């Protein structure tokens, strides 16, 4: 079993942001897959919704909304914050549309395994 040493609160906040978006836009299905290795933790979230629109490069910018009607309910900070958290943990946030419909977001965090834990 691998030892995860990334910041649990940060990972949970990113999971909350990404799952909230997936549930908001999904038609019927949201899939979550977690992969933990000695090098990284990867959280993949996929939905069967409409996918990202033409501005996929802007999705992780602050205050970005694909739907202007969301301005009243959402501040457009979730994907931005998630990207910043991933980057500050030596990782990245990958966003893509899925060929058969929907979107997939992968949050990757570097796994800081302590040397003494590796030697055990």
Range-by-range predicted roles:
Residues 78-82:
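Short alpha-helical Gxxx[C/S/T] motif in the catalytic ATP-binding
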Residues 16-17, 21:
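Conserved polar catalytic motif of the HATPase_c/GHKL fold
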Residues 47:
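Acidic ATP/Mg2+-coordinating residue in the GHKL
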């Amino acid at each position: 079993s691998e030892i995860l040493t990334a910041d649990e609160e940060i990972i949970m906040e990113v999971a909350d942001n990404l799952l909230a978006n997936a549930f908001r836009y999904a038609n019927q299905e949201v899939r979550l897959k977690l992969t933990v290795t000695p090098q990284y933790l990867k959280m993949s979230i996929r939905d069967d919704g409409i996918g990202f629109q033409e501005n996929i490069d802007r999705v992780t910018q602050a205050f970005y909304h694909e739907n202007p009607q969301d301005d009243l309910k959402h501040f457009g900070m979730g994907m931005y914050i998630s990207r910043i958290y991933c980057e500050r943990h030596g990782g990245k946030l990958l966003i893509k549309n899925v060929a058969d419909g929907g979107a997939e977001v992968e949050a990757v965090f570097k796994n800081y395994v302590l040397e003494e834990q590796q030697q055990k």
